[in-house]
UniProtKB/Swiss-Prot annotation:
Substrates-to-products reaction catalysed: [(1->4)-alpha-D-glucosyl](n) + ADP-alpha-D-glucose = [(1->4)-alpha-D-glucosyl](n+1) + ADP + H(+)
Family label: Belongs to the glycosyltransferase 1 family. Bacterial/plant glycogen synthase subfamily.
Classification via HAMAP family: Glycogen_synth
Pathway it works in: Glycan biosynthesis; glycogen biosynthesis
Organism domain of life: Bacteria
Protein name, UniProt field: Glycogen synthase
Keyword Metal-binding in annotation: no
GO molecular function terms listed in the Swiss-Prot or TrEMBL record: alpha-1,4-glucan glucosyltransferase (ADP-glucose donor) activity; alpha-1,4-glucan glucosyltransferase (UDP-glucose donor) activity
């Protein structure tokens, strides 16, 4: 089966969020399972540097100007790059400039991405043509619209990684991006008078997936639907919306082979985790005390991630003898709040503003509990990494967090499926109650080890996701 993923990021070459991790791992897992899978991306500078042995597949004039389509390989996966320097060769992130302003021509930059994916489905590369075009998030949403406009030369799947980002643009651009004017309709890609690239994907895709079963249900409700809940509820009733969990790449996230750790360990030999904890306490200026549980945050510092609740609950956490480590960047108010907490509680709170992939591994290896109290979480990767490292996740029961973490209730402990802690209501009191329960388990080291081993034995591999996507593709074909 020939599958083309369409997206804007690829780990480890270019990453602004979890989307890059997904596209960096899923195609390789699909290839290992026997599918002929390739990826299409804009030729952003970091991607051009990392893709080797480039060949020119096509040269063409488009509504966005002159474009070359290049082909190369990365980590055994075939990669198409859309080389249009005037659109993609810029400093800053793929989406905004160094002053954090969205590029004014994003409508054109990502329309071109969708258009080229459709051209590949129509035979632009004479040596390879996809049977399924799998588009990811709003950046690739127009793939589904162009395919619909061209008579659906390939089946289309659209995956929602985060419904909050919708790709909204002025209606006057419809003519320039060369889609039928009839598509600008409430039964199409119109959303409150604007073009929505996200809605284009949701409306025109043959099938929509979310990155967890619970999130697929949540986005049919007003609380999580961002105005798309009506369309998504219809897709659910039609059998055209489902949830498939993301996975973990064991080549990157495996404590038994992770060279970024001070000491390697596995679920059968956990003692070396103590050395990672000691090194983390040293690195973050915490009191060296193996009896004090380290709670960690590795996240964008935003209210969506529930990190204002962590600040509210922090006094209670520290009173019980816990320590807190924070790695992340985001809202200025939250950054200042955590920095102030570190200044007020030396030896108990350590904060590093910014994101460092290597240091996130050290935190996973050294912390005891990872905090993920998100108000909503489509899938979440942090808790999956934590499970692999025996760092018990403490999560709010929403989205993918609900699908991947089993609370340490008496029933789950008895059934041998407990893997962390969860709470329902999005407030500091509920979070603090879950923290208190984690201290109860911490006071029983043998039981804590038992739950660690349960967590580390859970299978959230990309092989499982690859099989689920293959089953979906086959149903469409």
């Amino acid at each position: 089966m020939q599958v083309l993923h369409v997206c804007s990021e690829l780990f480890p070459l270019l990453k602004t969020g979890g989307l890059a991790d997904v596209v960096g791992a899923l195609p390789a897992a699909q290839i290992a399972a026997g599918d002929d899978t390739r990826v299409l991306l804009p030729a952003f500078p970091d991607l051009k540097k990392g893709i080797t042995q480039i060949q020119v597949v096509a040269q063409l004039q488009t509504f966005a100007g002159y474009v070359e389509l290049h082909f190369g390989h990365f980590n055994g996966v075939g990669i198409y790059l859309i080389d249009a320097p005037g659109l993609y060769d810029r400093p800053g992130s793929p989406y905004h400039d160094e002053s954090q302003y969205a590029y004014s021509d994003n409508y054109l930059r990502f329309a071109l991405l969708g258009w080229v994916s459709c051209e590949l489905a129509c035979g632009l590369d004479p040596w390879w043509r996809p049977e399924v075009v799998h588009a990811h998030d709003w950046h690739a949403g127009l793939s589904c619209a162009y395919l619909a406009a061209r008579g659906r030369p390939a089946k289309s799947v659209f995956t929602v990684h985060n419904l909050a980002y919708q790709g909204l643009f002025n209606a006057r651009h419809m003519e320039q991006i060369q889609l039928p004017h009839s598509f600008f309709d409430v039964y199409g890609m119109e959303f409150h008078g604007q073009i929505s690239y996200l809605k284009a994907g949701l409306f025109y895709a043959d099938h929509v997936t979310a990155v967890s079963p619970t999130y697929a249900r949540e986005i049919t409700q007003p609380e999580f639907g961002y105005g798309m809940e009506g369309l998504l509820k219809q897709r659910l009733l039609e059998g055209r919306l489902s949830g498939i969990l993301n996975g973990v790449d064991p080549a990157i996230w495996n404590p038994a082979h992770d060279l970024l750790l001070a000491a390697r360990y596995n679920r059968d030999v956990l003692d070396a985790k103590r050395e990672n904890k000691r090194q983390l306490q040293i690195a973050m200026g915490l009191k060296i005390d193996e009896k004090a549980p380290i709670f960690a945050v590795v996240s964008r510092l935003t209210k969506q991630k529930g990190l204002d609740l962590v600040l509210e609950a922090l006094p209670g956490l520290l009173e019980q003898g816990g320590q807190l480590v924070v790695l992340g960047a985001g809202d200025a108010e939250l950054q200042q709040g955590f920095l102030a907490a570190a200044a007020e509680n030396p030896g108990q709170v350590g904060v590093q503003i910014g994101y460092h992939e290597a240091f996130s591994h050290r935190i996973m290896g050294g912390a005891d509990v990872i905090l993920v109290p998100s108000r909503f979480e489509p899938c979440g990767l942090t808790q999956l990494y934590a499970l692999k490292y025996g760092t018990l996740p403490l999560v709010r029961r929403t989205g993918g967090l609900a699908d991947t973490v089993n609370d340490c209730s008496l029933e789950n402990l008895a059934d041998g499926i407990a893997s962390g802690f969860s709470f329902e209501d999005s407030n500091a009191w509920s979070l603090l109650r879950a923290i208190r329960r984690s201290f109860v388990l911490w006071s029983r080291p043998s039981l804590w080890r038992y739950v660690q081993r349960q967590a580390m034995g859970m299978d959230f591999s990309w092989q499982v996701a690859a099989v689920a996507y293959r089953d979906l593709y086959q149903r469409l074909l």
